[in-house]
Regions:
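Short loop/turn motifs at secondary-structure boundaries
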Residues: 68, 106-107, 162-168, 179-184, ...
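Beta-strand-rich ligand- or partner-binding modules
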Residues: 1-79
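Short, compositionally biased P/S/T/A/G/V-rich stretches that sit at domain boundaries
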Residues: 35-59, 152-177, 181, 188, ...
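Beta-sandwich strand segments
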Residues: 24-30, 134-148, 194-196, 259-268, ...
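Long, low-complexity serine/threonine/glycine- and acidic-rich segments characteristic of extracellular
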Residues: 1-16, 20-28, 33, 85, ...
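Short solvent-exposed strand-capping/beta-turn motif centered on an Asx-Ser/Thr pair
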Residues: 20, 48, 57, 69-77, ...
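Enriched for extracellular/lumenal, surface-exposed ectodomains of secreted and cell-surface proteins
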Residues: 86, 127-140, 255-260, 364-367
Length: 392
């Protein structure tokens, strides 16, 4: 009885028989020798039954999908089955993942199902898979326990697209904006596998008129981050609502990177804008002037909020009001340069065409709002009144 021998300590045994006959001096003639034992189980990888590997070329961030069947072809049960997965790159750097499956019973199969996100991989890769590695449990043979396949991870090289707007408007250097602007930073990426979900990959700073720079991050109370959640629309948004407390020129600097580290441009987005705290209207004119069929009004608003009760009056040179253009008719207005959606066609309040000639116009403002401060030498605008000419 050899059951007392530790099989782990003595994994291999050899039985020798020694006989001795002091009388007849004739060796015993052995008729047979029978050994009773529990045979080790035997598992194999059955590629013919099931084998899945989604592609030999994957986009960075795409999930590697692998599946194969393990089968116990012996009459003895196996304990819980250990599986080892190894990914090796061109530099022989390895990623090893172990998985423990249910016990593999005699003549039964189990599915090895392994998915791995390739976001940290790039270039040529080798994938090794092995059941019962490192002699985890007794087995008759191990040569049929492993397999290997190669694949390639295509690196994301395309940069994300960055878009910045102030109160819904794209501005240029020198534009006037509100003292409490709503700045929307929109980042889009074509990658269908790596979401824009890391706010740390977006750098935002604001330089005030004194040259002081403030950096904003996810912890800043003025900032909110909306991560991308849909791979079909890989878009992240940052809302920034700074309170700009002094007059002067500010500079906003923004740089964004996608999940692969591609930056939105060789140079950061940078725009310089002006804040004027006092509420006023200036640089009022109509265009075209003279006009024959229609004209629009252009003016600059400063301060924090657009006044609710702004309107424009059209008058004859004798001072008679012939047309009132209400706030609602003017259309959407903002702090900064405005060009009204409204196009005046040269008619009065009753829809009648006015005669050719010179007319006056005036912007009506709240009592506490400063009047026009035209910065341009404008021969058509004097003492709060502008001149327009109808010429049909």
């Amino acid at each position: 009885d050899l059951s007392t021998i530790n099989a782990t300590e003595y994994p291999y045994l050899r039985l020798d028989m020694y006989t001795m006959d002091d009388i007849d001096r004739t060796p015993v003639n052995l008729k047979f020798w029978r050994v009773f034992y529990d045979a080790a189980p035997e598992a194999i990888l059955n590629k013919d039954d099931t084998f899945v590997f989604n592609s030999d070329t994957l986009q960075q961030g795409q999930i590697m999908e692998f599946a194969i069947k393990a089968e116990n072809i012996s009459s003895n049960d196996m304990d819980s089955l250990l599986v080892k997965y190894t990914i090796t790159n061109e530099n022989n750097e390895t990623i090893i993942v172990y998985d423990r499956l249910e016990p593999l019973k005699s003549n039964e199969t189990q599915l090895l199902d392994f998915n791995y996100n390739t976001k940290a991989l790039q270039g040529d890769q080798q994938f090794n898979f092995e059941i019962n590695p490192e002699g985890d449990q007794p087995e008759k043979f191990v040569f049929n326990n492993f397999g290997v396949t190669d694949f390639y991870v295509r690196t994301d090289r395309k940069e994300p697209v960055l878009d910045v707007s102030f109160d819904g408007i794209h501005i240029i250097n020198g534009d006037i904006v509100a003292a409490n602007p709503f700045i929307l930073i929109d980042i889009r990426d074509e990658n269908e596998f790596l979401l824009l979900d890391d706010p740390e990959k977006i750098m935002i700073s604001l330089i005030d008129p004194n040259g002081n720079e403030v950096e904003y991050n996810i912890a800043s109370p003025e900032l909110s981050f909306e991560a991308a959640t849909d791979l079909n629309n890989n878009q992240a948004k940052i809302s920034l609502e700074p309170l700009l407390s002094q007059d002067g020129d500010y500079t906003l600097v923004v740089q964004a990177a996608d999940a692969s580290g591609n930056i939105s441009g060789d140079n950061a987005y940078e725009v310089t804008f002006r804040v004027i705290l006092r509420e006023s209207v200036s640089n009022v004119l109509n265009y075209p002037n003279p006009f024959s069929s229609q004209t629009q009004f252009i003016f600059t608003l400063t301060g924090s909020e657009v006044p609710d009760d702004i309107s424009i009056s059209i008058l004859t040179v004798s001072g008679k009001v012939v047309k009132e253009i209400s706030r609602e008719e003017l259309g959407p207005l903002r702090i900064g340069l405005n060009r009204t959606d409204y196009k005046w066609n040269g008619t009065d309040d009753f829809g009648e065409k006015l005669a050719n000639g010179v007319y006056l116009y005036k912007v009506n403002l709240p009592a506490d709002m400063e009047r026009y401060e035209n910065q341009y030498a404008d021969r058509f605008f004097t003492k709060g009144f502008g001149k327009l000419v109808i010429m049909r």
